[in-house]
Every structure is written in structure tokens, then in C-alpha cells.
């Protein structure tokens, strides 16, 4: 029970940490700028839009904890991770330019799943340890959880940039050429490393202002210049490439959640160490 709880907790934290990281990039770097939110306001609105995730967790956590004390943790923890997996798949099916209500509802669903898992899993891990060893058990549980959260940033950032790199050069080249930028200049701008593009979008910076020389736009119409160097064109330009990385990341998170549910099933029925 102790091992199963820690393994499932590790996998859950690995999926959840990556989710928060990827969604913030999605909102702050792509969706909010495309909908006219000023770059300086995107961090605030990213936090507001992810509130349903926390609300679902907060509301279901205490209820699941109380119920698991009576009926055992296995059903609640495993069921919660399966619900979270469904939520991740639904996120992967959303278009990059999603509607608000489905997005918020899916985040709430994932929060509910995580809330159903967290408290019962913690209780199960602690109950499996003798009373005189519960301090060490708590430390081991926290180490698994914190290590997974830190590791998830590297894992999901790598997944996101891998998906981005697959289509970014072609998409950027075609997008710039469609506005009248010459092929050599467009190709040079499109060769920017995917990590740089991702961070530029995340920080609210349009790198086209430095990647494309002013001389290359001297013959363009004024509207085309304003579009290229404005705040909305760059997020729209890279959105299809970012979408590939997002979908891959969410499917990986769903797989991790299913594995966490499977690991949770091995914890056995309700058990409290009497030592």
C-alpha cells in the first residue's frame, strides 16, 4: 500500500505539474494575445482562467478524504486519476483557439479528478506506516511529489518544444511570405530556435521586430507592416505549430494519469497500521 501510494502520487504530480505549465503558456503566449488582451495583463488573466482547476481540487479534496476514511482510498484515488485522464484527452481535442466555457469546464473536471485523488492517497500512504515511522513516511511522500513536480517542467517543456519544432519553420515561412516578405528573409526568420520562439510568446515579445530588417519591409503596405510588427500576428502565426506540442503534452499527461490509476489499484483495501 505504501509503495503503490507513492508511485501513484509521483505519476499524478508528474501529470499535474506539466498541465499547469503547458496551460499557462497556451493562455499567456497564444490565446489571450489573440483575443486582444494586452501582454502586460496576460499573467493576471492566465491565473483567472485556471481558477476552475483549483476550485475543483479544493471542493472535492475534503469530501474525498472524509469518504476514503470510511470506504478506503482505492476507489476514490483510482477513479480520480481516470477522471483527470479524461480531462486531459478533452483538452487535447480542443482547438488552439478554444471557446471559454468548454475550456473552463474541462479544467474543473481535471481539478475534480485531482481532488478525488490527493487526500485519499495521502491518507492511504500515512496509514500504511507504523505510528513511529510516519514522520519518515511523510518525508518520503513529499519527496516523491516534489521531485515529480520539478521533473514535469523539464519533461513537458521538452514535449512542447518537440511538437513546436516539427512544423514551426514551414508555418513561419509561409505566413511571412503571404504578407510580402521575401523568401530568404522569411526562411532566415523561421530558422529561429523553437525555444526562443516559445519564450518570446510567453514573455509577450514579438521577435519579428528584430528578425526582419526594416529594409525588407520598405516596399510593403503600411497595414502589412503594422500587422507583422504588432502584438497579435506573431501569436497567430505560431499557433498551429504550438497546437501540435500542446496535443502531444496533453496525451502524455493522460497516459501518466492512467498509469497512476493503475498503480493506485495495487494499494489494496482499507488498511491502517496498528503498530
Regions found by a protein language model. Give the residues of each.
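Short helix-coil transition/hinge motifs at the ends and kinks of transmembrane helices
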Residues: 29-44, 170-185, 228-239
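Transmembrane helices with small-residue packing motifs
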Residues: 91-98, 164-172, 268-272
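Residue-level signal for alpha-helical transmembrane segments in multi-pass membrane proteins
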Residues: 63, 90-94, 155, 160, ...
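Small-residue-rich alpha-helical segments with characteristic i,i+4
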Residues: 8-10, 19, 103-195, 199, ...
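Transmembrane core module of solute transporters
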Residues: 1-136, 152
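Transmembrane-helix exit segments and adjacent C-terminal regions of multi-pass membrane proteins
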Residues: 69-74, 81, 188-275
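A general structural signal for well-ordered secondary-structure junctions
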Residues: 1-3, 33, 150, 165, ...
Amino acid at each position: 500500500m505504501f509503495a503503490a501510494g507513492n508511485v501513484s502520487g509521483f505519476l499524478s504530480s508528474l501529470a499535474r505539474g506539466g498541465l499547469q505549465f503547458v496551460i499557462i503558456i497556451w493562455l499567456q503566449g497564444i490565446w489571450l494575445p489573440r483575443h486582444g488582451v494586452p501582454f502586460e495583463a496576460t499573467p493576471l488573466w492566465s491565473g483567472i482562467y485556471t481558477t476552475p482547476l483549483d476550485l475543483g481540487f479544493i471542493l472535492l479534496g475534503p469530501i474525498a478524504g472524509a469518504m476514503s476514511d470510511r470506504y478506503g482510498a482505492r476507489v476514490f484515488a483510482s477513479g480520480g486519476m481516470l477522471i483527470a485522464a479524461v480531462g486531459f484527452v478533452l483538452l487535447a481535442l480542443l482547438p488552439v483557439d478554444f471557446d471559454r466555457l468548454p475550456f473552463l469546464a474541462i479544467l474543473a473536471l481535471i481539478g475534480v479528478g485531482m481532488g478525488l485523488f490527493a487526500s485519499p492517497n495521502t491518507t492511504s500512504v500515512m496509514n500504511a506506516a507504523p505510528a513511529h515511522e510516519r514522520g519518515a513516511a511523510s518525508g518520503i511522500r513529499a519527496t516523491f511529489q516534489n521531485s515529480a513536480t520539478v521533473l514535469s517542467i523539464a519533461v513537458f517543456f521538452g514535449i512542447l518544444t518537440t511538437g513546436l519544432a516539427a512544423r514551426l519553420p514551414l508555418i513561419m515561412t509561409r505566413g511571412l511570405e503571404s504578407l510580402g516578405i521575401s523568401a530568404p528573409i522569411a526562411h532566415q526568420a523561421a530558422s529561429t530556435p523553437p525555444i526562443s520562439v516559445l519564450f518570446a510568446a510567453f514573455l509577450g515579445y514579438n521577435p519579428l521586430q528584430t528578425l526582419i530588417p526594416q529594409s525588407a519591409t520598405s516596399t510593403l503596405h503600411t497595414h502589412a507592416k503594422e500587422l507583422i510588427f504588432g502584438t497579435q500576428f506573431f501569436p497567430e502565426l505560431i499557433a498551429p505549430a504550438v497546437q501540435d506540442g500542446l496535443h502531444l503534452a496533453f496525451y502524455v499527461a493522460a497516459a501518466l494519469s492512467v498509469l497512476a490509476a493503475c498503480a493506485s489499484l495495487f494499494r489494496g483495501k482499507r488498511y491502517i497500521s496498528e503498530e
